[in-house]
């Protein structure tokens, strides 16, 4: 039957077609690796993914996704079934057909046709439909398969457990999925049929001496778990290990706590023992410590309290973990606005301890092992002493080591496998808080560590006592937000870079009162301010565009930053502010000269105030806003608070020859290359060369200040008045002022 006939048959049987409806079945699923993303069911044989809703069955709302990002489709492949009976029947038919061919030529063609039909029937009976799944990348930014970018117009086969990501190679992302083939009954690993009916086994998460932990997906719900697969052949003859495994299962079945990995399912077969566990996708606490170097005290308190509550719950059930360490503490995926949830896992060494029963098995990690275990280990070989065993107190010691690491990024005892010197340090409890990182840790935290790391197990604090410690009631931890150098043994501590400190914005244009950065002086105004303002109002239009540009460093001072450093270095001249000004009109020269003469007396009276105030450096951004570099009160450059009290302007140039004054006469004088800048209020600025906290800048500043006391002519006012009235300008130089009308607005604001 040709293709045209196949297309016409459904048209002739329209009524019958309405009675029969073929519903596509679910053949695959993309299981989301992110807790807040949903799964994607694969029903059609060819599915397009992308941002274009008209051409894609699955629309992905992400700016990095292309219109047609990729295509996932299935291809049918034949799979032969070997049947000996059918093969023998086919051979007999072929022999009979050959005999008929010898007898009659006319029947030969018929027999050949029948023979071909029989062969076709045999082939149809011996084949079954099977599919492979492929993915084609059609995107610009790339589609990631198993962590590697596929490449545009390239196709590859995806199998059970392969990770497919549409945006990045990261495992946990909003568009990262794990492919699950629901129709293929075969998997690569030789796992039991009962387990395969319920779960799809995928990549390895961890390995042990007798078990392997893998990722698994429940087929009916798509939920992701971790399964611990134990091969019975490796331990079934070992009584001690067998009891240990049975004890672990018994413990896990009893535990129900939000901070402990819970057991989901148990499947046992002749060969394997499967323990399906809750999966924490946030990684290990050990990796988080390596990444951060150390935790702030509030973070450490929140994390350690969850660990302590989990261990206390175990101890209430008369259970000891025996192997507490950051590697066995997992972090669940963090949702937006929620704190991370800690999960204690790996009970491979845990046992149920009776009231009169004490375990004497040496176990645990040496870095977190308790002194009583060390004593038993050191005296066990010689047989001089009988092992006294140990109980739940070993978990408390391990908790003390974990808290020490959280707050410092370093272990309390560095273990060396070459000798037992460090074991003696553990046995004697020789640790200290000498690192600089401990300077900002509260005494309550240190006291809790001391009680947890008590070498005498009888005097060691319990988990209940630790939860009621004063450290968990101490909420005054604001000073712990200070930036501390990274003390992690993994990475070196970064060098502190000198930069400009940013403070909250002070808008000098919004008020009509003079303002400086010294909050200790009182508010006084010049009696000639009104005259200056009246004269300057006539020339507002001429100076409307006085400031054409300011240095690019002002872009770093934004309104949202309170205390932030910049990476720009102002040591070179190219980084200093470059100012461009327009020449004032000739009529303005005379007005400015008169104003300058009137202001000389007032400025001379303010010399003493200027000497005592020590004017603070400031910055004006393109919007005309004032930014203070330092407003320290206790000689601490990082104790910065914005001034709110208007004070008297500082205008004495004899003590600030390298500084810039912005008096009420609406001008600014900047250092040896200063220029008059019209502003609306009075502030004091130092030279931009001082704004960088560098050694070179401090040295140059001191040289300029020493030279300024001898020659006040180092302060030069770039003004067109200089060539007209030198005498007046000399007075202006000595007083560090210059008069210009204020602009109506700053250009570029």
From Swiss-Prot:
Domain Protein kinase: 199-472
Entry annotation: catalytic residues: 323
Domain FHA: 47-150
Domain of life: Eukaryota
UniProt record, GO biological process: DNA damage checkpoint signaling; DNA damage response; mitotic DNA damage checkpoint signaling
Catalytic activity: L-seryl-[protein] + ATP = O-phospho-L-seryl-[protein] + ADP + H(+); L-threonyl-[protein] + ATP = O-phospho-L-threonyl-[protein] + ADP + H(+)
Record-given protein name: Probable serine/threonine-protein kinase fhkD
Gene source species: Dictyostelium discoideum
């Amino acid at each position: 039957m040709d293709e045209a006939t196949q297309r016409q048959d459904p048209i002739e049987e329209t009524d019958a077609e309405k009675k029969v409806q073929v519903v596509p079945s679910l053949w695959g699923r993309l299981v989301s690796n992110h807790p807040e993303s949903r799964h994607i069911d694969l029903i059609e044989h060819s599915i397009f993914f992308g941002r274009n809703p008209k051409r894609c069955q699955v629309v992905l709302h992400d700016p990095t996704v292309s219109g047609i990002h990729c295509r996932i489709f299935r291809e049918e492949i034949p799979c032969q079934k070997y049947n000996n009976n059918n093969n023998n029947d086919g051979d007999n038919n072929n022999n009979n057909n050959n005999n008929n061919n010898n007898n009659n030529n006319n029947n030969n063609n018929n027999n050949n046709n029948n023979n071909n039909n029989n062969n076709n029937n045999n082939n149809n009976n011996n084949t079954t439909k099977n599919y492979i799944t492929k993915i084609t990348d059609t995107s610009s930014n790339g589609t990631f398969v198993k962590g590697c970018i596929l490449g545009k117009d390239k196709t590859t086969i995806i199998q059970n457990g392969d990770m497919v990501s549409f945006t990045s190679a990261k495992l946990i992302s909003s568009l990262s999925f794990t492919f699950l083939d629901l129709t293929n009954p075969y998997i690569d690993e030789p796992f039991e049929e009962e387990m395969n009916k319920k779960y799809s086994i995928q990549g390895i998460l961890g390995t042990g001496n007798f078990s392997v932990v893998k990722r698994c997906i429940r087929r009916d719900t798509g939920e992701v778990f971790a399964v611990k697969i134990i091969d019975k052949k490796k331990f079934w003859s070992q009584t001690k290990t067998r009891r240990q495994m049975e004890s672990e299962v018994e413990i896990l079945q009893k535990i129900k706590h939000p901070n402990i990995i819970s057991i989901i399912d148990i499947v046992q077969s002749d060969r394997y023992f499967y323990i399906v566990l809750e999966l924490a996708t946030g990684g290990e606490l050990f990796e988080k410590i390596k990444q951060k170097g150390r935790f702030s005290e509030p973070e450490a308190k929140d994390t350690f309290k969850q660990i302590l509550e989990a261990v206390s719950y175990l101890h209430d059930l008369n259970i000891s973990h025996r192997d507490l360490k950051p590697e066995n503490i997992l972090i669940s995926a963090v949702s937006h606005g929620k704190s991370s949830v800690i999960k204690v896992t790996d009970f491979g060494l845990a046992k149920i301890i009776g009231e009169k029963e004490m375990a004497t098995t040496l176990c645990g990690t040496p870095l977190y092992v308790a002194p009583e275990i060390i004593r038993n280990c050191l005296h066990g070989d010689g047989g001089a002493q009988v092992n006294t065993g140990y109980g739940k107190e070993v978990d408390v010691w391990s908790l003390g080591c974990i808290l020490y690491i959280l707050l410092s990024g370093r272990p309390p005892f560095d273990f060396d496998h070459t000798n037992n010197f460090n074991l003696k340090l553990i046995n004697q409890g020789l640790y200290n808080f000498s690192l600089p990182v401990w300077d900002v840790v509260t005494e309550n935290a240190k006291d809790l560590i001391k009680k947890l790391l008590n070498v005498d197990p009888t005097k060691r604090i319990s988990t209940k006592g630790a939860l009621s410690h004063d450290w968990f009631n101490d909420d005054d931890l604001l000073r712990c937000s200070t930036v501390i150098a990274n003390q992690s043994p993994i990475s070196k501590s970064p060098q502190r870079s000198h930069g400009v400190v940013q403070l909250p914005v002070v808008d000098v244009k919004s008020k009509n009162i003079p303002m400086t950065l010294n909050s200790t002086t009182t508010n006084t105004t010049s009696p000639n301010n009104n005259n200056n303002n009246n004269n300057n109002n006539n020339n507002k239009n001429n100076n409307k565009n006085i400031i054409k540009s300011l240095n690019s460093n002002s872009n770093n001072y934004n309104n949202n930053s309170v205390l932030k450093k910049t990476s720009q270095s102002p040591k070179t001249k190219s980084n200093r502010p470059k100012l461009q000004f327009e020449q004032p009109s000739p009529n303005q020269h005379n007005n400015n000269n008169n104003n300058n003469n009137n202001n000389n007396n007032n400025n001379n009276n303010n010399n003493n105030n200027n000497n005592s105030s020590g004017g603070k450096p400031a910055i004006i951004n393109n919007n005309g806003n004032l930014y203070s570099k330092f407003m320290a009160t206790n000689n601490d450059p990082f104790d910065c608070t914005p001034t709110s009290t208007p004070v008297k302007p500082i205008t004495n140039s004899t003590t600030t020859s390298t500084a810039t004054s912005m008096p009420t006469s609406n001008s600014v004088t900047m250092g040896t290359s200063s220029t008059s800048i019209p502003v609306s209020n009075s502030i004091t600025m130092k030279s931009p060369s001082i704004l960088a906290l560098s050694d070179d800048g401090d040295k140059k500043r001191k040289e300029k200040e020493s030279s300024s006391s001898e020659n006040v002519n180092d302060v030069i006012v770039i003004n067109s008045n200089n060539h007209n009235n030198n005498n007046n300008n000399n007075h202006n130089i000595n007083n560090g002022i210059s008069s210009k009308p204020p602009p109506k607005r700053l250009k570029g604001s």
